[in-house]
A protein has these predicted regions:
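Bacterial Sec-dependent N-terminal signal peptides
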Residues: 1, 7, 14-39
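Residue-level detector of extended alpha-helical repeat arrays and alpha-solenoid scaffolds
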Residues: 86, 147-150, 167, 225, ...
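Mobile, glycine-rich extracellular loop/lid and propeptide segments
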Residues: 141-154, 161-164, 169-173, 177, ...
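Aromatic- and acid-rich polysaccharide-binding/catalytic face
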Residues: 148, 226-227, 231, 298-310, ...
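Noncatalytic carbohydrate-binding groove/subsite architecture in carbohydrate-active enzymes
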Residues: 226-227, 231-295, 302, 307, ...
Length: 428
Protein backbone atom coordinates (compact mmCIF):
# COMPACT_ATOMS: atom_id res chain seq x y z
CA UNK A 1 0.00 0.00 0.00
CA UNK A 2 2.90 2.33 0.69
CA UNK A 3 3.58 2.85 -3.01
CA UNK A 4 0.00 4.04 -3.63
CA UNK A 5 -0.01 6.35 -0.61
CA UNK A 6 3.33 7.77 -1.69
CA UNK A 7 2.09 8.30 -5.24
CA UNK A 8 -1.03 10.00 -4.01
CA UNK A 9 0.96 12.32 -1.73
CA UNK A 10 3.28 13.21 -4.58
CA UNK A 11 0.33 14.05 -6.79
CA UNK A 12 -1.26 16.09 -4.03
CA UNK A 13 1.96 18.03 -3.54
CA UNK A 14 2.26 18.60 -7.26
CA UNK A 15 -1.27 19.89 -7.45
CA UNK A 16 -0.69 22.42 -4.64
CA UNK A 17 2.53 23.63 -6.27
CA UNK A 18 0.83 24.12 -9.60
CA UNK A 19 -2.08 25.97 -8.00
CA UNK A 20 0.14 28.35 -6.03
CA UNK A 21 1.73 29.58 -9.25
CA UNK A 22 -1.62 30.46 -10.86
CA UNK A 23 -3.54 33.12 -8.90
CA UNK A 24 -6.50 32.99 -11.29
CA UNK A 25 -7.16 29.35 -10.49
CA UNK A 26 -8.70 28.12 -7.26
CA UNK A 27 -6.22 26.12 -5.21
CA UNK A 28 -7.50 22.63 -4.56
CA UNK A 29 -6.03 19.30 -3.53
CA UNK A 30 -5.54 16.55 -6.10
CA UNK A 31 -8.18 13.84 -5.87
CA UNK A 32 -6.80 10.42 -6.81
CA UNK A 33 -8.69 8.73 -9.62
CA UNK A 34 -8.38 5.31 -7.99
CA UNK A 35 -9.14 4.09 -4.52
CA UNK A 36 -6.17 2.82 -2.57
CA UNK A 37 -6.19 -0.97 -2.48
CA UNK A 38 -4.34 -3.27 -0.10
CA UNK A 39 -1.16 -4.99 -1.22
CA UNK A 40 -1.22 -8.72 -1.84
CA UNK A 41 0.86 -11.08 0.27
CA UNK A 42 2.77 -14.23 -0.59
CA UNK A 43 0.04 -16.18 1.18
CA UNK A 44 -2.46 -14.61 -1.20
CA UNK A 45 -0.49 -16.04 -4.12
CA UNK A 46 -1.14 -19.58 -2.97
CA UNK A 47 -4.79 -18.82 -2.23
CA UNK A 48 -5.22 -17.49 -5.74
CA UNK A 49 -3.48 -20.38 -7.46
CA UNK A 50 -5.22 -23.04 -5.38
CA UNK A 51 -8.57 -21.44 -6.19
CA UNK A 52 -7.75 -21.36 -9.90
CA UNK A 53 -7.07 -25.08 -9.84
CA UNK A 54 -9.98 -25.94 -7.58
CA UNK A 55 -12.55 -24.31 -9.83
CA UNK A 56 -11.06 -24.58 -13.32
CA UNK A 57 -8.97 -27.75 -13.53
CA UNK A 58 -10.69 -30.96 -14.56
CA UNK A 59 -9.33 -33.11 -11.76
CA UNK A 60 -10.06 -36.32 -13.64
CA UNK A 61 -8.50 -35.49 -17.02
CA UNK A 62 -5.91 -32.93 -15.85
CA UNK A 63 -6.63 -30.41 -18.52
CA UNK A 64 -8.26 -27.07 -17.83
CA UNK A 65 -11.90 -26.23 -18.38
CA UNK A 66 -13.14 -23.29 -20.36
CA UNK A 67 -15.09 -21.81 -17.45
CA UNK A 68 -16.54 -22.44 -14.02
CA UNK A 69 -19.84 -23.30 -15.70
CA UNK A 70 -18.29 -26.41 -17.25
CA UNK A 71 -18.46 -29.59 -15.21
CA UNK A 72 -15.74 -31.30 -17.23
CA UNK A 73 -13.25 -30.62 -20.02
CA UNK A 74 -14.78 -33.04 -22.51
CA UNK A 75 -13.46 -31.63 -25.78
CA UNK A 76 -13.06 -28.44 -27.79
CA UNK A 77 -16.81 -27.83 -27.99
CA UNK A 78 -17.71 -29.21 -24.60
CA UNK A 79 -15.90 -27.57 -21.73
CA UNK A 80 -12.21 -27.82 -22.55
CA UNK A 81 -10.13 -24.66 -22.65
CA UNK A 82 -8.44 -23.88 -25.97
CA UNK A 83 -5.54 -26.09 -27.04
CA UNK A 84 -3.12 -23.16 -27.32
CA UNK A 85 -3.96 -21.91 -23.81
CA UNK A 86 -3.32 -25.21 -22.05
CA UNK A 87 0.50 -24.81 -22.23
CA UNK A 88 0.26 -21.43 -20.50
CA UNK A 89 -1.58 -23.16 -17.66
CA UNK A 90 1.25 -25.71 -17.59
CA UNK A 91 3.70 -22.80 -17.39
CA UNK A 92 1.81 -21.62 -14.33
CA UNK A 93 2.20 -25.03 -12.69
CA UNK A 94 5.93 -25.00 -13.40
CA UNK A 95 6.18 -21.51 -11.95
CA UNK A 96 4.33 -22.72 -8.84
CA UNK A 97 6.83 -25.57 -8.52
CA UNK A 98 9.78 -23.17 -8.85
CA UNK A 99 8.22 -20.72 -6.41
CA UNK A 100 7.61 -23.44 -3.80
CA UNK A 101 11.18 -24.65 -4.23
CA UNK A 102 12.54 -21.12 -3.80
CA UNK A 103 10.48 -20.73 -0.62
CA UNK A 104 11.82 -24.01 0.75
CA UNK A 105 8.33 -25.50 1.00
CA UNK A 106 8.99 -29.16 0.18
CA UNK A 107 5.34 -30.14 0.54
CA UNK A 108 4.21 -27.62 -2.05
CA UNK A 109 7.23 -28.42 -4.21
CA UNK A 110 6.23 -32.09 -4.37
CA UNK A 111 2.58 -31.22 -4.90
CA UNK A 112 3.22 -28.97 -7.86
CA UNK A 113 5.81 -31.27 -9.38
CA UNK A 114 3.10 -33.91 -9.41
CA UNK A 115 0.70 -31.42 -10.95
CA UNK A 116 3.22 -30.68 -13.70
CA UNK A 117 3.51 -34.40 -14.42
CA UNK A 118 -0.26 -34.85 -14.38
CA UNK A 119 -0.86 -31.92 -16.71
CA UNK A 120 1.57 -33.25 -19.29
CA UNK A 121 0.00 -36.70 -19.13
CA UNK A 122 -3.52 -35.31 -19.26
CA UNK A 123 -2.86 -33.05 -22.20
CA UNK A 124 -0.99 -35.75 -24.08
CA UNK A 125 -3.89 -38.16 -23.66
CA UNK A 126 -6.42 -35.54 -24.71
CA UNK A 127 -4.58 -34.02 -27.67
CA UNK A 128 -4.03 -37.01 -29.96
CA UNK A 129 -1.11 -38.35 -27.93
CA UNK A 130 0.85 -35.31 -29.16
CA UNK A 131 0.72 -36.59 -32.72
CA UNK A 132 1.28 -33.25 -34.41
CA UNK A 133 0.28 -34.73 -37.76
CA UNK A 134 -3.24 -35.40 -36.48
CA UNK A 135 -5.28 -32.48 -37.78
CA UNK A 136 -8.72 -33.40 -36.49
CA UNK A 137 -10.47 -30.19 -35.46
CA UNK A 138 -11.61 -31.35 -32.05
CA UNK A 139 -8.59 -32.75 -30.22
CA UNK A 140 -5.95 -32.37 -32.92
CA UNK A 141 -3.60 -29.79 -34.39
CA UNK A 142 -4.90 -27.54 -37.14
CA UNK A 143 -3.27 -24.10 -36.80
CA UNK A 144 0.46 -23.44 -36.72
CA UNK A 145 0.50 -21.19 -33.68
CA UNK A 146 -1.47 -23.71 -31.59
CA UNK A 147 1.44 -26.09 -32.07
CA UNK A 148 4.16 -23.49 -31.50
CA UNK A 149 2.79 -22.42 -28.11
CA UNK A 150 3.25 -26.03 -27.06
CA UNK A 151 6.74 -26.12 -28.59
CA UNK A 152 7.75 -23.26 -26.31
CA UNK A 153 6.36 -24.73 -23.10
CA UNK A 154 7.69 -28.21 -23.80
CA UNK A 155 11.16 -26.70 -24.24
CA UNK A 156 10.78 -24.83 -20.95
CA UNK A 157 9.66 -28.03 -19.25
CA UNK A 158 12.77 -29.81 -20.50
CA UNK A 159 14.89 -26.92 -19.25
CA UNK A 160 13.33 -27.27 -15.80
CA UNK A 161 12.98 -31.03 -15.40
CA UNK A 162 15.42 -32.54 -17.90
CA UNK A 163 12.89 -35.08 -19.20
CA UNK A 164 14.06 -36.18 -22.65
CA UNK A 165 10.50 -36.73 -23.89
CA UNK A 166 9.80 -33.03 -23.43
CA UNK A 167 12.75 -32.05 -25.59
CA UNK A 168 11.88 -34.63 -28.23
CA UNK A 169 8.28 -33.41 -28.46
CA UNK A 170 9.37 -29.78 -28.54
CA UNK A 171 11.80 -30.35 -31.39
CA UNK A 172 9.37 -32.56 -33.28
CA UNK A 173 6.65 -29.91 -33.06
CA UNK A 174 9.05 -27.14 -34.10
CA UNK A 175 9.94 -29.08 -37.24
CA UNK A 176 6.31 -29.89 -37.96
CA UNK A 177 5.45 -26.17 -37.95
CA UNK A 178 8.51 -25.02 -39.88
CA UNK A 179 8.52 -27.64 -42.63
CA UNK A 180 4.91 -28.81 -42.71
CA UNK A 181 3.53 -32.32 -42.51
CA UNK A 182 3.90 -34.93 -45.21
CA UNK A 183 0.82 -36.64 -43.78
CA UNK A 184 -1.37 -33.53 -43.69
CA UNK A 185 0.02 -32.13 -46.92
CA UNK A 186 0.69 -28.55 -45.83
CA UNK A 187 3.94 -26.89 -46.90
CA UNK A 188 4.86 -25.44 -43.52
CA UNK A 189 4.67 -22.15 -41.72
CA UNK A 190 8.04 -20.88 -42.91
CA UNK A 191 7.60 -18.40 -45.78
CA UNK A 192 10.87 -19.14 -47.53
CA UNK A 193 12.13 -15.98 -49.29
CA UNK A 194 14.01 -18.14 -51.79
CA UNK A 195 10.64 -19.49 -52.93
CA UNK A 196 9.18 -16.00 -53.34
CA UNK A 197 7.12 -16.21 -50.14
CA UNK A 198 8.58 -13.11 -48.53
CA UNK A 199 9.93 -14.38 -45.22
CA UNK A 200 8.41 -14.77 -41.79
CA UNK A 201 5.90 -17.39 -40.69
CA UNK A 202 2.41 -18.11 -42.00
CA UNK A 203 -0.32 -18.44 -39.39
CA UNK A 204 -2.33 -21.32 -40.86
CA UNK A 205 -2.81 -23.81 -43.65
CA UNK A 206 -6.07 -23.99 -45.59
CA UNK A 207 -8.15 -25.98 -46.10
CA UNK A 208 -7.39 -27.93 -42.93
CA UNK A 209 -7.98 -31.12 -44.90
CA UNK A 210 -6.11 -31.42 -48.22
CA UNK A 211 -4.52 -27.97 -47.92
CA UNK A 212 -3.24 -25.74 -50.67
CA UNK A 213 0.27 -24.28 -50.47
CA UNK A 214 0.52 -20.92 -48.75
CA UNK A 215 1.16 -17.92 -50.97
CA UNK A 216 3.13 -14.74 -50.31
CA UNK A 217 0.03 -12.64 -49.58
CA UNK A 218 -1.37 -14.99 -46.94
CA UNK A 219 -1.52 -13.92 -43.32
CA UNK A 220 1.61 -13.75 -41.20
CA UNK A 221 0.55 -13.05 -37.64
CA UNK A 222 2.61 -11.83 -34.71
CA UNK A 223 1.21 -14.75 -32.69
CA UNK A 224 3.18 -17.25 -34.78
CA UNK A 225 6.26 -15.19 -35.63
CA UNK A 226 7.44 -14.10 -32.19
CA UNK A 227 6.56 -17.41 -30.47
CA UNK A 228 8.64 -19.11 -33.16
CA UNK A 229 11.60 -16.98 -32.09
CA UNK A 230 10.95 -17.80 -28.43
CA UNK A 231 10.80 -21.50 -29.28
CA UNK A 232 13.96 -21.40 -31.40
CA UNK A 233 15.96 -19.59 -28.73
CA UNK A 234 14.68 -21.77 -25.89
CA UNK A 235 15.70 -24.84 -27.87
CA UNK A 236 19.02 -23.18 -28.70
CA UNK A 237 19.61 -22.84 -24.97
CA UNK A 238 18.88 -26.51 -24.31
CA UNK A 239 19.99 -28.75 -27.15
CA UNK A 240 23.49 -30.26 -27.02
CA UNK A 241 26.41 -28.85 -28.97
CA UNK A 242 28.12 -30.81 -31.69
CA UNK A 243 25.06 -32.09 -33.50
CA UNK A 244 25.28 -32.89 -37.21
CA UNK A 245 22.77 -31.13 -39.44
CA UNK A 246 19.96 -33.39 -40.61
CA UNK A 247 19.64 -33.99 -44.35
CA UNK A 248 15.96 -35.01 -44.10
CA UNK A 249 13.38 -32.95 -45.97
CA UNK A 250 11.38 -32.67 -42.74
CA UNK A 251 14.02 -32.74 -39.96
CA UNK A 252 12.93 -33.72 -36.47
CA UNK A 253 15.74 -31.70 -34.90
CA UNK A 254 18.08 -28.77 -35.56
CA UNK A 255 21.60 -28.03 -34.47
CA UNK A 256 22.20 -25.40 -31.84
CA UNK A 257 23.49 -23.06 -34.54
CA UNK A 258 20.44 -23.65 -36.73
CA UNK A 259 18.03 -22.76 -33.94
CA UNK A 260 19.86 -19.49 -33.32
CA UNK A 261 19.95 -18.66 -37.02
CA UNK A 262 16.25 -19.40 -37.45
CA UNK A 263 15.38 -17.31 -34.42
CA UNK A 264 17.39 -14.36 -35.69
CA UNK A 265 15.91 -14.63 -39.18
CA UNK A 266 12.29 -14.69 -38.09
CA UNK A 267 12.89 -11.96 -35.53
CA UNK A 268 14.43 -9.67 -38.14
CA UNK A 269 11.51 -10.21 -40.51
CA UNK A 270 8.93 -9.70 -37.77
CA UNK A 271 10.49 -6.50 -36.47
CA UNK A 272 10.68 -5.07 -39.99
CA UNK A 273 7.11 -6.03 -40.85
CA UNK A 274 5.16 -6.12 -37.59
CA UNK A 275 6.75 -3.59 -35.24
CA UNK A 276 6.72 0.20 -35.09
CA UNK A 277 10.31 0.58 -33.91
CA UNK A 278 9.70 4.20 -32.88
CA UNK A 279 7.07 3.25 -30.29
CA UNK A 280 7.38 -0.47 -29.55
CA UNK A 281 3.89 -1.22 -30.85
CA UNK A 282 3.38 -4.68 -32.33
CA UNK A 283 0.91 -5.15 -35.18
CA UNK A 284 -1.39 -8.14 -35.14
CA UNK A 285 -0.61 -9.29 -38.67
CA UNK A 286 0.46 -8.48 -42.19
CA UNK A 287 -0.70 -9.90 -45.51
CA UNK A 288 1.88 -9.70 -48.28
CA UNK A 289 2.94 -6.12 -48.97
CA UNK A 290 -0.20 -4.65 -47.46
CA UNK A 291 -0.15 -2.39 -44.44
CA UNK A 292 0.25 -4.10 -41.07
CA UNK A 293 -2.91 -4.48 -38.99
CA UNK A 294 -2.13 -2.10 -36.14
CA UNK A 295 -4.33 -3.69 -33.52
CA UNK A 296 -2.89 -3.86 -30.01
CA UNK A 297 -2.90 -7.19 -28.20
CA UNK A 298 -1.00 -7.71 -24.96
CA UNK A 299 0.12 -11.23 -25.86
CA UNK A 300 1.79 -9.98 -29.04
CA UNK A 301 3.65 -7.35 -27.04
CA UNK A 302 4.56 -10.10 -24.58
CA UNK A 303 5.98 -12.58 -27.08
CA UNK A 304 7.96 -9.77 -28.73
CA UNK A 305 9.40 -8.89 -25.32
CA UNK A 306 10.27 -12.54 -24.72
CA UNK A 307 11.88 -12.99 -28.14
CA UNK A 308 13.92 -9.83 -27.63
CA UNK A 309 15.09 -10.86 -24.15
CA UNK A 310 16.17 -14.31 -25.33
CA UNK A 311 18.12 -12.90 -28.26
CA UNK A 312 19.74 -10.32 -26.00
CA UNK A 313 20.84 -13.03 -23.58
CA UNK A 314 22.12 -15.22 -26.42
CA UNK A 315 24.05 -12.52 -28.26
CA UNK A 316 24.69 -9.70 -25.80
CA UNK A 317 23.56 -7.24 -28.48
CA UNK A 318 21.89 -4.27 -26.79
CA UNK A 319 19.49 -3.60 -29.66
CA UNK A 320 17.44 -6.57 -28.51
CA UNK A 321 17.21 -5.31 -24.94
CA UNK A 322 16.27 -1.84 -26.21
CA UNK A 323 13.46 -3.40 -28.23
CA UNK A 324 12.17 -5.31 -25.22
CA UNK A 325 12.16 -2.19 -23.06
CA UNK A 326 10.37 -0.15 -25.71
CA UNK A 327 7.72 -2.84 -26.13
CA UNK A 328 7.20 -3.06 -22.37
CA UNK A 329 6.99 0.73 -22.11
CA UNK A 330 4.35 0.79 -24.84
CA UNK A 331 2.39 -1.90 -23.04
CA UNK A 332 2.55 -0.06 -19.73
CA UNK A 333 2.14 3.53 -20.87
CA UNK A 334 -0.08 3.31 -23.94
CA UNK A 335 -2.07 0.08 -24.02
CA UNK A 336 -2.71 0.25 -20.28
CA UNK A 337 -3.35 3.98 -20.23
CA UNK A 338 -7.06 3.99 -19.41
CA UNK A 339 -6.77 2.66 -15.87
CA UNK A 340 -3.01 2.13 -15.66
CA UNK A 341 -3.96 -1.55 -15.71
CA UNK A 342 -3.52 -4.16 -18.39
CA UNK A 343 -6.54 -3.98 -20.68
CA UNK A 344 -9.24 -6.61 -20.93
CA UNK A 345 -10.36 -7.87 -24.32
CA UNK A 346 -13.71 -9.58 -24.61
CA UNK A 347 -12.97 -11.95 -27.50
CA UNK A 348 -12.89 -15.69 -26.97
CA UNK A 349 -9.74 -16.77 -25.12
CA UNK A 350 -8.33 -13.23 -24.98
CA UNK A 351 -8.42 -13.19 -21.20
CA UNK A 352 -5.25 -15.30 -21.21
CA UNK A 353 -3.16 -12.43 -22.52
CA UNK A 354 -2.11 -11.30 -19.03
CA UNK A 355 -0.83 -14.80 -18.19
CA UNK A 356 1.27 -14.77 -21.37
CA UNK A 357 2.53 -11.29 -20.48
CA UNK A 358 3.47 -12.50 -16.99
CA UNK A 359 5.94 -15.02 -18.37
CA UNK A 360 7.83 -12.53 -20.49
CA UNK A 361 7.72 -9.40 -18.38
CA UNK A 362 9.24 -11.51 -15.59
CA UNK A 363 12.10 -12.44 -17.92
CA UNK A 364 12.70 -8.77 -18.70
CA UNK A 365 12.57 -7.76 -15.04
CA UNK A 366 14.63 -10.53 -13.48
CA UNK A 367 16.91 -11.70 -16.29
CA UNK A 368 17.71 -8.21 -17.55
CA UNK A 369 17.43 -6.24 -14.29
CA UNK A 370 14.63 -4.00 -15.61
CA UNK A 371 12.96 -3.58 -12.25
CA UNK A 372 11.14 -0.39 -13.26
CA UNK A 373 8.14 -2.52 -14.26
CA UNK A 374 7.59 -4.08 -10.84
CA UNK A 375 5.30 -1.29 -9.52
CA UNK A 376 3.10 -1.59 -12.62
CA UNK A 377 2.91 -5.36 -12.29
CA UNK A 378 2.06 -5.13 -8.60
CA UNK A 379 -0.59 -2.49 -9.29
CA UNK A 380 -2.33 -4.98 -11.58
CA UNK A 381 -2.06 -7.74 -9.00
CA UNK A 382 -3.33 -5.56 -6.18
CA UNK A 383 -6.39 -4.36 -8.09
CA UNK A 384 -7.19 -7.75 -9.56
CA UNK A 385 -6.89 -9.49 -6.21
CA UNK A 386 -8.82 -6.83 -4.30
CA UNK A 387 -11.68 -7.16 -6.80
CA UNK A 388 -11.78 -10.96 -6.80
CA UNK A 389 -14.80 -13.09 -6.04
CA UNK A 390 -14.28 -13.09 -2.28
CA UNK A 391 -16.06 -16.41 -1.78
CA UNK A 392 -14.15 -18.45 -4.36
CA UNK A 393 -10.94 -16.35 -4.49
CA UNK A 394 -11.23 -16.23 -8.29
CA UNK A 395 -10.11 -13.17 -10.21
CA UNK A 396 -11.62 -11.81 -13.39
CA UNK A 397 -10.03 -10.06 -16.34
CA UNK A 398 -11.19 -6.51 -15.66
CA UNK A 399 -9.01 -5.73 -12.69
CA UNK A 400 -10.72 -2.46 -11.78
CA UNK A 401 -14.13 -4.12 -11.48
CA UNK A 402 -15.37 -6.22 -8.59
CA UNK A 403 -16.26 -9.78 -9.52
CA UNK A 404 -19.84 -10.82 -8.88
CA UNK A 405 -19.77 -13.65 -6.39
CA UNK A 406 -20.78 -16.94 -7.94
CA UNK A 407 -20.86 -15.62 -11.50
CA UNK A 408 -19.34 -17.67 -14.32
CA UNK A 409 -15.64 -16.90 -14.82
CA UNK A 410 -13.65 -18.28 -17.72
CA UNK A 411 -10.26 -19.84 -17.11
CA UNK A 412 -8.59 -17.40 -19.50
CA UNK A 413 -9.59 -14.31 -17.52
CA UNK A 414 -9.06 -16.05 -14.19
CA UNK A 415 -5.47 -16.98 -15.03
CA UNK A 416 -3.92 -13.53 -15.24
CA UNK A 417 -3.61 -12.49 -11.60
CA UNK A 418 -2.36 -15.84 -10.24
CA UNK A 419 0.08 -16.03 -13.17
CA UNK A 420 1.53 -12.66 -12.21
CA UNK A 421 1.55 -13.52 -8.50
CA UNK A 422 3.51 -16.73 -9.03
CA UNK A 423 6.29 -14.82 -10.79
CA UNK A 424 6.35 -11.66 -8.67
CA UNK A 425 6.74 -12.31 -4.92
CA UNK A 426 5.01 -9.72 -2.78
CA UNK A 427 8.16 -8.96 -0.79
CA UNK A 428 10.53 -8.38 -3.71
Amino acid sequence: MKQYIFSALCLVSGAFCLSSGNDDKEARAYTPVYEIVPEYTNADTWKAYEAFNEHLLDQNKFIYKSSTADKAAVDRWNGAAAIWCQPTYWDMAMNAYKRAKAEGDTQKEQKFKQLCDDLLAGNKAHYANFDFDDNNENTGWFIYDDIMWWTVTLARAYELFGVEEYLSLSEESFGRVWYGSEKVGDTGSYADPEKGLGGGMFWQWQPIKNPNPNEADHGKMACINFPTVVAALTLYNNVPTGRTESTDSHPSYQTKEQYLAKGKEIYAWAVENLVDVTTGQVADSRHGNGNPAWKDHVYNQASYIGASVLLYKATGEKQYLDNAVMAADYTMNTISGTFDLLPFETGAEQGIYTAVFAQYIAMLVYDCDQTQYIPFVKRNINYGWANRDQTRNLCGGEYHKAQIEGATIDSYSASGIPALMLLFPADK
